[in-house]
Amino acid sequence: MLETTIRNKLAQKDILLMTHIVIGYPDLDTSFEVVRTMVEAGVDLMELQIPFSEPMADGPVILKANQDALATGITVDECFDFAEKVAAAYDIPFLFMTYYNILFKYGVEAFAERMAKCGLCGAIVPDLPPEEADDYLAAMNKHGMAPIFIYAPNTTEARMQRIAEHGKGFIYCMARKGVTGLQTDFSGQLGDHLDHCRASTQLPLALGFGVKDRADVEFIKGKADIAVVGSQAIRVLDEGGVPAVEAFIRSLR
């Protein structure tokens, strides 16, 4: 169970690292090398994004990675094969991140079933609110997968509690409104937001959107349980290749 795995890791570390890759960017072989490098550098769990043409929650860095991966002709089936390969190779939790159109076209039940067979632990689907997710929730629960839901800075406390009733594994907290990869003000206001998040759920909290260096990770310690690094890792890959990714991950804590 994902939550149990996270809590066991938190008994040994004061903050966990979750990274985000776009499957097939820049190609499948490099994607596998990035996963290997991140795991060896100490990443605790990882989001594997299935490329999509209109990734509404993602900023320019991850948007470009989605577009470039799609331009190679990558398919959803290839993404499942990749996920199965990395889940078999490395003993950390892997999650899918994608958009509902992918699940709808594949078939929600079939998608959840294949996730389980591949050894995945759960999924983040940013454009699917729990009120519209009955089929998804039923399929995820049936196959032992954790549906991860999102708290935004403007989510009311009452709504946070409703979301938490449906979520499993952890809650993904956005550090700010907007899309991924832009500048985030890691300050007292964000700390207050995380206090509200913590009060609304017993699930572990992950914080993403703008986490880029050790100072940001240090700020998150004691306020959330998981620091999520996405766009910055892709920037580092673009600028310095796979070896630079290892150095970057090791620099975060």
Curated annotation (Swiss-Prot):
Pathway info: Amino-acid biosynthesis; L-tryptophan biosynthesis; L-tryptophan from chorismate: step 5/5
A molecular function (GO) term: tryptophan synthase activity
Any matching Pfam family: Trp_syntA
Top-rank taxon: Bacteria
SUPFAM superfamilies: Ribulose-phoshate binding barrel
Functional summary from the UniProt entry: The alpha subunit is responsible for the aldol cleavage of indoleglycerol phosphate to indole and glyceraldehyde 3-phosphate.
Protein name: Tryptophan synthase alpha chain
Species, as recorded: Syntrophotalea carbinolica (strain DSM 2380 / NBRC 103641 / GraBd1) (Pelobacter carbinolicus)
Organism placement in taxonomy: Bacteria, Pseudomonadati, Thermodesulfobacteriota, Desulfuromonadia, Desulfuromonadales
Gene: trpA
